[in-house]
Amino acid sequence: VAGKLEMRECYGQALVEAGRENERIVLLEADLRKSTMGELFRQEFPERLFEVGIAEQNMIGMAAGFALTGWIAVASSFAVFASGRAFEQIRQSVALPRLNVKIGGSSAGLTDTGDGATHQSIADLAIMRALPNMTVLSPADGIEMKGAVKAMLEVD
């Protein structure tokens, strides 16, 4: 049952299901595919997983490039880094030109207690909601996560 699984597992599983249905989906990871469960996508679609290392800004630029060439790019990282480190690139390269880029922010809020304050994100929702042309989804459990991934991929 999805409600008993971790949200990140449901995220990874939902991406795999979507990848089976749509060959235009690519996943970009910022050295966290085991934490975000993008590893599940890599196992099934290794040619559509792009590991960029600890380089969230570059990941967003790459995702924008994929979107410009017809791919559906999903960029995954911890929420604190996806919203904070890559804010300028998201604003300039994704939000303002209205590109079809999806950003998955894992371990949002105070959920990442093991890595400490540097990995906790209390401003990610506010930051992303301040951007034009940005749709923000915030699931509360695994069931909602699977639905959120599906909804995210339907938003153009």
Outline where the language-model segments fall.
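Thiamine diphosphate
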Residues: 1-156
